[in-house]
Amino acid sequence: MKQTVWHHLKLCPQGDPQHTLADAAIAVENGTIVWLGAACALPVEYAAWPREDLHGAWVTPGLVDCHTHLVYGGQRADEFAQRLAGVSYEEIARQGGGIVSTVRATRAADEASLLRQSAARLEPLLAEGVTTVEIKSGYGLDLASERKMLRVARQLGERYPVTVYTTFLGAHALPPEFTGRADAYIDEVCNTMLPALADEGLVDAVDVFCERIGFSLEQSERVFKAAERYQLPVKMHAEQLSNGGGTALAARHHALSADHLEFLDEAGVAAMKEAGTVAVLLPGAYYFIRETQLPPLELLRRYQVPIAISTDSNPGTSPATSLLLMMNMATTLFRMTVPEVLQGVTSHAARALGKADRHGSLEAGRAADFAVWSVDSLAELAYWIGRPLCARVVRAGETVYTRRELSQGLR
């Protein structure tokens, strides 16, 4: 039985910097928080437990990256150069590039290679305090390759000190062998791929890319109904490039989240509020493909829709492996506040996964997953660009990462 009192710390238990404790303590037994609060109120039964002094550092819940595509083969730097030369993302996709080029690389890679490549993308997130991550499939687009991706995602969760939730995104793009036969491909997704992968326990949720270069409302709804037959929650890539009404459809199916949302209108926002659907904003993609249409932040605020922030880490539109950078981008590009972005990577991000009862906040009875920060103010998490701020990551009560400090000595 391992018992520890973490003390001499400043605590932000709910991911809200407006509600903090200046001198706090956390009592952890066998990886679970049994008590937390003001250090002066530490119950006598924990007073003799071994102590871990955090020297006045800030502690937040472990961060949650709730929308990623970390598992894939290759990279798309050449397409990045094309876009710099003036070719649009949609034009590249129609030429057989974009998602489909990553499909080719992912299909060609074996499981061991995919694991190595994906681990290199996961590790920087862990070093920034991320203890929970969602990973989507969607670069296989056939049963064997989608299975391979989801198996690798599960292995990442087994090999690294991070909780991984998997999302089946078979309806991400039309594979080359189904050119001109989108409905037939959706048949394959709904009747072959999803049943097999769900039966194998590889799927925690189901996503669909509902867009003019993706799948229609009718096709998206077929995927949702198939997911519901397996009692799997749904989510949607929606309103990124146009207002197609996907968010309203997602809300009708009580989606956990609708993601991107640059072209979301008020009717869609109202539908999200009614359904309890979280808005996941992805500033990395907005920045990387040079979008100019901002997501409707004021409408989301007015309707009190929870807003999460994520990396959208992927090879084509957001090759990002820094959730802290996304916090900065959300403040500078989307005009979000520091409390909004911190909740966006903790409590609201956990809610976007349907896991707010397990992650995104610190309270008695939950796993002791938290990040320790070398900052004077929590605003620094969104302020600094490229500076390593996470001093320690604790998962289930155990230190799983400690930043090595460079020598400060003069020569």
Curated annotation (Swiss-Prot):
EC main group: hydrolase
Q: Name one Pfam family in it.
A: Amidohydro_1
Residues binding N-formimidoyl-L-glutamate, per UniProt: 139, 314, 316
Asked if the keyword Nucleotide-binding belongs to this entry, the reply reads no
Localization in the cell: Cytoplasm
Q: What pathway is this protein a component of?
A: Amino-acid degradation; L-histidine degradation into L-glutamate; N-formimidoyl-L-glutamate from L-histidine: step 3/3
> Catalytic activity annotated for this protein?
4-imidazolone-5-propanoate + H2O = N-formimidoyl-L-glutamate
| Enzyme Commission number(s) of this protein | 3.5.2.7
Q: Which GO terms describe its molecular function?
A: imidazolonepropionase activity; iron ion binding; zinc ion binding
Copy out the cofactor comment. Binds 1 zinc or iron ion per subunit.
Q: Which family does it belong to?
A: Belongs to the metallo-dependent hydrolases superfamily. HutI family.
| Free-text function comment from the UniProt entry | Catalyzes the hydrolytic cleavage of the carbon-nitrogen bond in imidazolone-5-propanoate to yield N-formimidoyl-L-glutamate. It is the third step in the universal histidine degradation pathway.
- Please identify the protein, giving its name as recorded: Imidazolonepropionase
Protein's gene = hutI
